[in-house]
Amino acid sequence: MQYLPIFTKLDNKPVLVVGGGDVALRKCSALLKARASITLVAPKFCQQLIELASENKVTLIHEYFSEQHLKNMMLVIAATDLEHVNSQVFELANAHNIFVNVVDDQPKCTFIFPSIVDRNPITIAISSAGTAPVLARRLREKLETLIPQHIGPLATLVGGFRSKVKQRFKHFADRRQFWEGVFDSSVVSKVQTGDTQAAEQQLEHMLNAKAEPEGEVYVVGAGPGDPELLTLKALQLMQQADVVVYDYLVSDEIMELVRRDADLICVGKRLGDHSVAQQDTNQMLVDLAKQGKKVCRIKGGDPFIYGRGGEEVQVLAANKVNYQIVPGITAAAGCSAYAGIPLTHRDHAQAIQFVTGHCKKDGQELDWQSLAKPNQTLAIYMGVIKSPHIQAELLKHGRNANTPVAIIENGTRKNQRVITGKLGELADLITRNSVVSPALLIIGEVASLHQELHWFGAKAQTSSFAQPLTDVA
């Protein structure tokens, strides 16, 4: 280990920065976060540093560097583009036993700046000992995606309870067990959702009584299939869950990202094949949460867009089960983007309607008159089986038979397939190409842009019709 990682409290401590340009400005930004007392010395300064001085955030000395500037300094940073000046700063600081950093010159550093993940008061520092700063930055970027923003407020909250916990539990092992229970409880999720008052109340309760484990359900949208389209929050909750309840629409690649030791429960959901009835799924979520489990109810797309997430959350709320809702990229947005089809376009579509082809058996019929209007895009979920009916009703209510359509099968996934054609042949396209779910139907002029804007996967299989279809509008 070339450098000992330590954290230094610089609050009002004197720090010298030699230099007056952009590099010096960057170093000042980090030092100001630590509330250091910063003095800069240089013959001239950039405008941003002059503005900081006018706000009394830094002190500027318009002089060339000399040994006298080192007096009483705790740290020194050389941030000039003059090698001989940087060397002079290093040698004199070393002679006075002052820690010194020469920017981008690792051999002339007795301390270095790490890459930082800041979740105040939690701070994570990553260093390559000056050998590969770009690699250290990339590691920081990875950690930024994995460490949620609420970690900082959580640390602040529990920090306020440390003395109470020490009074309550005299032995270290007991205190450690208590804190493990806190971080496994819904105190964390309450902070995450911004309800710090409820989190504090629960902490007080846990401190004064032996609380039963409190379960919670995360209703998570997994997006259309590509695991890189998951939100950070979805990934974090997937990796916290004790139990994962999922549908067939959730891709295998996404399921690979759940916590390794979590129990996996598949509840089906294909047309005509509901391996678990919806009401049974609802009750299962309640029962698991009442057992103190953290349950991730993961759904393809967005849970509140044709995912029956609203029904499940209603049951959770009625049973007073804690829950969180994590939106996902809905199929219409994700699949159309991966097919190079903008859902709206100034020249083609000023409106969009999301439609399901799988309504309740006794449900109200769709407003076909509205759906058949021109200059709009229809994004139809679960419409493969009902495509003959969809086609017939749109034509019957005046939509042009030559209206472009696109069928996106397994959108955003490695096996994505796009089939394009005209509304008048929609059902035939699906039959001839043996389209299977999950598939999204896009109906509207924007579907014609696929060939021009294609970027992912194979280009569309186009209609075999050489001539435009007869306008039956």
From Swiss-Prot:
Instruction: Show the segment(s) annotated as Uroporphyrinogen-III C-methyltransferase.
Output: 215-473
Keywords, A to Z, come to: Cobalamin biosynthesis, Lyase, Methyltransferase, Multifunctional enzyme, NAD, Oxidoreductase, Phosphoprotein, Porphyrin biosynthesis, S-adenosyl-L-methionine, Transferase
A GO MF label: NAD binding
State which Enzyme Commission number(s) the record gives.
2.1.1.107, 1.3.1.76, 4.99.1.4
Gene3D superfamilies named among the record's database cross-references: Cobalt-precorrin-4 Transmethylase, Domain 1, Methyltransferase, Cobalt-precorrin-4 Transmethylase, Domain 2, NAD(P)-binding Rossmann-like Domain, Sirohaem synthase, dimerisation domain, Siroheme synthase, domain 2
Q: Per its UniProt record, what InterPro entries does this chain match?
A: 4pyrrol_Mease, 4pyrrol_Methylase_sf, 4pyrrole_Mease_sub1, 4pyrrole_Mease_sub2, CobA/CysG_C, NAD(P)-bd_dom_sf, Siro_Cobalamin_biosynth, Sirohaem_synt_dimer_dom_sf
Q: Which residues form the active site?
A: 247 (proton acceptor), 269 (proton donor)
Q: In which pathway does it act?
A: Cofactor biosynthesis; adenosylcobalamin biosynthesis; precorrin-2 from uroporphyrinogen III: step 1/1; Cofactor biosynthesis; adenosylcobalamin biosynthesis; sirohydrochlorin from precorrin-2: step 1/1; Porphyrin-containing compound metabolism; siroheme biosynthesis; precorrin-2 from uroporphyrinogen III: step 1/1; Porphyrin-containing compound metabolism; siroheme biosynthesis; siroheme from sirohydrochlorin: step 1/1
Reactions accelerated catalytically: uroporphyrinogen III + 2 S-adenosyl-L-methionine = precorrin-2 + 2 S-adenosyl-L-homocysteine + H(+); precorrin-2 + NAD(+) = sirohydrochlorin + NADH + 2 H(+); siroheme + 2 H(+) = sirohydrochlorin + Fe(2+)
Q: Which residues carry this modification: Phosphoserine?
A: 128
User: Mind listing the GO biological process terms from this record?
Assistant: cobalamin biosynthetic process; methylation; siroheme biosynthetic process
Instruction: Give the matching Pfam families.
Output: CysG_dimeriser, NAD_binding_7, Sirohm_synth_M, TP_methylase
Annotated residues that bind NAD(+) are located at 22-23, 43-44
- Report the leader peptide range: none
Q: Where exactly are the transmembrane stretches of this chain?
A: none
- Binding of S-adenosyl-L-methionine occurs at 224, 300-302, 305, 330-331, 382, 411
Q: Can you tell which superkingdom this protein's organism belongs to? A: Bacteria
Looking up NCBIfam families in the UniProt record yields: cobA_cysG_Cterm, cysG_Nterm, PRK06136.1, PRK10637.1
Which family does the record assign? In the N-terminal section; belongs to the precorrin-2 dehydrogenase / sirohydrochlorin ferrochelatase family. In the C-terminal section; belongs to the precorrin methyltransferase family.
Record's function text: Then it catalyzes the NAD-dependent ring dehydrogenation of precorrin-2 to yield sirohydrochlorin. Finally, it catalyzes the ferrochelation of sirohydrochlorin to yield siroheme.
Q: What is this protein called?
A: Siroheme synthase
Q: What is the source species?
A: Pseudoalteromonas translucida (strain TAC 125)
Q: What is the lineage of its organism?
A: Bacteria, Pseudomonadati, Pseudomonadota, Gammaproteobacteria, Alteromonadales
